[in-house]
Amino acid sequence: MIILGIDPGLTVTGWGVVAKSGSRLSHVANGQIRTDNKATMAERLVELDSALAAVIDIYKPDTGAVEEVFVNVNPQSTLKLGQARGVAMVAVARSGIPVAEYPTKVIKKALVGTGGAEKQQIQHMLKILLPGVQLAGEDASDALAVAITHANMLGSHR
């Protein structure tokens, strides 16, 4: 089974793809999508949608998961993040792929054992779970964490 994880953001969206075979996970790919901050909001959302559609077309995931939005101190930032997250969910769902959602604390707890884990702890655990993985950046590592969480949740529901 091929699983796509997405860490949505308007400036940078991370994506990660893992393969699950039984209880074994392996890294397939990861990357980051940067939108042009000089473009209009609509243009940036289209750019994000197109890039995610390309990732889905290349890796053909069986299922996907998106990190839930956290409420930011700045309402504008929260709104922009929510719009990027909506585009990510639509990109996956439009492809006929089931899409799940996980809060940040659930993802951190699934990977590190505590919902208050730091980014460095997540990256360290990714290198243990996916030996040899080269991370494209923090957002890509967060997306791989989303994919691994989804893989584990799928396994626990069977």
From Swiss-Prot:
The UniProt subunit note reads as follows: Homodimer which binds Holliday junction (HJ) DNA. The HJ becomes 2-fold symmetrical on binding to RuvC with unstacked arms; it has a different conformation from HJ DNA in complex with RuvA. In the full resolvosome a probable DNA-RuvA(4)-RuvB(12)-RuvC(2) complex forms which resolves the HJ.
Q: How is the cofactor bound?
A: Binds 2 Mg(2+) ion per subunit.
Q: Which PROSITE patterns match?
A: RUVC
Report the superkingdom from the record: Bacteria
Extract one GO molecular function annotation from the record: magnesium ion binding
Location(s), subcellular? Cytoplasm
* Key words, A-Z: Cytoplasm, DNA damage, DNA recombination, DNA repair, DNA-binding, Endonuclease, Hydrolase, Magnesium, Metal-binding, Nuclease
Q: What does this protein do?
A: The RuvA-RuvB-RuvC complex processes Holliday junction (HJ) DNA during genetic recombination and DNA repair. Endonuclease that resolves HJ intermediates. Cleaves cruciform DNA by making single-stranded nicks across the HJ at symmetrical positions within the homologous arms, yielding a 5'-phosphate and a 3'-hydroxyl group; requires a central core of homology in the junction. The consensus cleavage sequence is 5'-(A/T)TT(C/G)-3'. Cleavage occurs on the 3'-side of the TT dinucleotide at the point of strand exchange.
- EC number(s) per entry: 3.1.21.10
Q: What is this protein called?
A: Crossover junction endodeoxyribonuclease RuvC
Gene behind the chain: ruvC
Where, by residue number, does Mg(2+) 1 bind? 7, 139
What cofactor does this chain's UniProt record say it requires?
Mg(2+)
| GO biological process terms on file | DNA recombination; DNA repair
